């Protein structure tokens, strides 16, 4: 769970995709794509935050004296960890799909040259997937905060 997702802006195909869009005067697609990539970067930061919160929570739970409470909290924490891991996988899949689409379009443009009509990635289906992911992550954050508050109260 501590493996960080690679930054999507660092991918060479993303840079090349932006260059092609810029050369073709597709400013609106540049803005949409940047917005999408910024959103993904923000979600990565939230995943990293959640990962550290779960680790902190596990450490706090280990210090609890009451074995019944400790085991209950461990169980809840494991559920939260699974949710965070699932969110991380979902985000990774979305990034892979975006990068695959970008790579395909860059390669098509290279192959067909300037005569080719520049295709752009379809942003809308990625946005829908990210909204669902965001709702799931938000619920996970709330669960984690509630559990941390319970641990602090004990």
Task: Walk through the language-model features, giving the residues of each.
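Leu/Val/Ala/Ile-rich N-terminal alpha-helices, chiefly Sec-type signal peptides and the beginnings
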Residues: 1-85, 89
